[in-house]
């Protein structure tokens, strides 16, 4: 029997009725019902028959189905147990799809890649990410040093703009720095609310993040570097000096030391965090080695 694509209002509604499925707001469930949007996502992903895909939050399989037609293998993580029988049904025609009923934030992703995707020449994360945990998912995947070549992911427009933001813009912040430290970022397309069931409260964006061969700057302790950059944006209207001063209010550090540190790195203490490029933050971090009393 021929079925319509899952990513159509007719088929999605039929599946909802068939399984008596009710959306869980707590899981941020919004199913894509526009095949053209999905084709745009797949085109941006440069998928071929040697590509392995990691998908997060497949739902009923609207994106999964189209990925399975283009990629060598698809490994989809779905946290909602209620969707597992639905996916078993909708993915039956595709023997290259593996559905894993786990929370992506708790799963041993390296193990699953070894188990399912080792024969793939390239690995991409392609997903309509759950909006309530988009940032933790991306940071978790990037910071694990997994053999992932890139990401083409849909998310809340505001978050996507922060990932892709340039220095000096309103959206630029600590998330921009982490994303651009590991990847080259670009916007693929803006997605209206109307192509989801149910429609979300916000507009969406598809962002492409391709892994850099090496990070954009040379840092010896990434966690400490990211803590330092995050602190610079703790209160956006404050200067970088004031934000760093507020970290050391216990009095153990002489305020003059922070000024010395900023000036040694060539950073005007009156600047705000959003005006510093990643390279300037790297210079600031590397200068920390000479100021051991400043501990992040």
Swiss-Prot record:
Q: Which Pfam families does UniProt cross-reference here?
A: RrnaAD
* Entry GO CC: cytosol
Q: Which InterPro entries match?
A: KsgA/Erm, rRNA_Ade_diMease-like_C, rRNA_Ade_Mease_Trfase_CS, rRNA_Ade_methylase_Trfase_N, rRNA_adenine_dimethylase, SAM-dependent_MTases_sf
SMART domains recorded for this chain? rADc
Q: Which PROSITE patterns match?
A: RRNA_A_DIMETH (PS01131), SAM_RNA_A_N6_MT (PS51689)
Please tell me which top-level EC class this enzyme sits in.
transferase
Disulphide bonds in the chain? none
Positions annotated to bind S-adenosyl-L-methionine: 30, 32, 57, 78, 103, 128
The protein's UniProt keywords, in alphabetical order, are:
Cytoplasm, Methyltransferase, RNA-binding, rRNA processing, S-adenosyl-L-methionine, Transferase
Provide the reaction this enzyme catalyses: adenosine(1518)/adenosine(1519) in 16S rRNA + 4 S-adenosyl-L-methionine = N(6)-dimethyladenosine(1518)/N(6)-dimethyladenosine(1519) in 16S rRNA + 4 S-adenosyl-L-homocysteine + 4 H(+)
Q: Enumerate the subcellular locations listed in this protein's record, separating them with semicolons.
A: Cytoplasm
GO molecular function per UniProt: 16S rRNA (adenine(1518)-N(6)/adenine(1519)-N(6))-dimethyltransferase activity; RNA binding
Q: What is its EC number?
A: 2.1.1.182
Which family does the record claim for this protein? Belongs to the class I-like SAM-binding methyltransferase superfamily. rRNA adenine N(6)-methyltransferase family. RsmA subfamily.
Record's function text: Specifically dimethylates two adjacent adenosines (A1518 and A1519) in the loop of a conserved hairpin near the 3'-end of 16S rRNA in the 30S particle. May play a critical role in biogenesis of 30S subunits.
This protein is called Ribosomal RNA small subunit methyltransferase A
Organism name: Staphylococcus saprophyticus subsp. saprophyticus (strain ATCC 15305 / DSM 20229 / NCIMB 8711 / NCTC 7292 / S-41)
Classification from the root reads: Bacteria, Bacillati, Bacillota, Bacilli, Bacillales
Q: What is the gene name?
A: rsmA
